[in-house]
Every structure is written in C-alpha cells, then in structure tokens.
C-alpha cells in the first residue's frame, strides 16, 4: 500500500455506494411484501417483520454505505417490537440516519430474485413507495426482477431474495 493513504480514513469523498442482500423462505400466507407493496401470492415468507426482502436489502445497502452495520443490529429479530413490523419503518429510520450525517440517496437499483410471484404489475407502485420513503423522485429508484433459471432453493420455489445497490451523495457537497 502506498504511504500516501496508510493510516488515513477516506472521509473526503462526496459519494458512497452500498450493497444489500436479503433472502426469506416461503411460509403460510396469501401474499408477500415486496418494495412496500402487498403482492398476492400462493404463500408468504417466514420472517420476524413483514419479510420485505427489497426493503431489507435497501436498509443494508444504506447502512453499509455509511459503515453503520446492518439491519439486524438496528432492528434485532429478538426484539418483540419488530414482530410483524412494516419494513417501511426500517427504511425511514435508515434515511433519518443518512440525513443526520448530511447524506442523501442519489439512486437505488433493486433486483428481486424469484420464480414467483411475477412483479411487473407492481413495479411502479414499488418505485413510487420507495421514493416516498427516501424523499426522492421515483426516477431515482429502479425495481426489476429476475429468476434463478430454476436453480437452487429459489428455482425450487422455496423462497425469494433481493439485491439492492444504493448511491449516496453529500447533501451540502462539503468535504469533511
């Protein structure tokens, strides 16, 4: 490593990138929550909260970009307050943490990984809902889906997952 950066923390950048991932097995119910939207499905997910893999991965991406741990540290599954909780509460909390540190979401790129349900009819509602939670324009939020081509637990219809990448930028543009 160059002596130039040895022992220094890189805090002077005006952008940061975070990546999040979440996965849940299917369980009894008639819907799944995805991107804050109730999507009818033959089953739900096994989770402590509402099990929204997109919003959980979004929280992890935001927290990771700030170096603030993960969703489990902020909302432990052992805490009964979060039993069945709306994952939008988690996203609003993470957004508050960003704002308190003078950061803002620049854009979100979310991918649901599932064989079913098909999410195309719900994508615009997801984008708009996530944008409201983050206080950004819907154009700053991308939501899409892919399958696992029949491979693994997702391919067997046993669950679903999501990956989210988030770009943060400084609200005031000041380098610290």
Curated annotation (Swiss-Prot):
Q: What are the names of the required cofactors?
A: a divalent metal cation
Look up the EC number in the record and give it.
Answer: 4.6.1.12
Q: What binding partners and quaternary form does the record give? A: Homotrimer.
Q: Name one Pfam family in it.
A: YgbB
The organism named in the record is Xylella fastidiosa (strain Temecula1 / ATCC 700964)
Protein purpose: Involved in the biosynthesis of isopentenyl diphosphate (IPP) and dimethylallyl diphosphate (DMAPP), two major building blocks of isoprenoid compounds. Catalyzes the conversion of 4-diphosphocytidyl-2-C-methyl-D-erythritol 2-phosphate (CDP-ME2P) to 2-C-methyl-D-erythritol 2,4-cyclodiphosphate (ME-CPP) with a corresponding release of cytidine 5-monophosphate (CMP).
Catalytic reaction(s) noted:
4-CDP-2-C-methyl-D-erythritol 2-phosphate = 2-C-methyl-D-erythritol 2,4-cyclic diphosphate + CMP
- The gene that this protein is the product of is ispF
Gene3D superfamilies in alphabetical order: 2-C-methyl-D-erythritol 2,4-cyclodiphosphate synthase (3.30.1330.50)
Q: Where does a divalent metal cation bind?
A: 22, 24, 56
Please list the residues that bind 4-CDP-2-C-methyl-D-erythritol 2-phosphate: 22-24, 48-49, 70-72, 146-149, 153, 156
**Name of protein:** 2-C-methyl-D-erythritol 2,4-cyclodiphosphate synthase
The record ties this protein, via NCBIfam families, to: ispF
């Amino acid at each position: 490593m160059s002596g130039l950066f040895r022992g220094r923390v890189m805090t002077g950048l005006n952008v940061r990138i975070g990546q999040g991932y979440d996965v849940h097995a299917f369980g009894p119910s008639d819907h799944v929550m995805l991107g804050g939207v109730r999507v009818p499905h033959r089953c739900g997910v096994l989770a402590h909260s509402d099990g929204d893999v997109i919003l959980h991965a979004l929280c992890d991406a935001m927290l990771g970009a700030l170096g603030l741990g993960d969703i489990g540290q902020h909302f432990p599954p052992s805490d009964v307050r979060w039993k069945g909780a709306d994952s939008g509460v988690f996203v609003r909390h993470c957004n508050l943490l960003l704002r308190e540190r003078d950061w803002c979401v620049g854009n979100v790129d979310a991918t649901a990984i599932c064989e079913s349900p098909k999410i195309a009819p719900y994508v615009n509602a997801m984008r708009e809902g996530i944008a409201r939670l983050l206080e950004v324009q819907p154009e700053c939020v991308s939501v899409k889906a892919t399958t696992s081509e029949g491979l693994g637990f997702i391919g067997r219809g046993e669950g679903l997952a999501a990956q989210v990448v988030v770009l943060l930028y400084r609200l005031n543009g000041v380098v610290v």
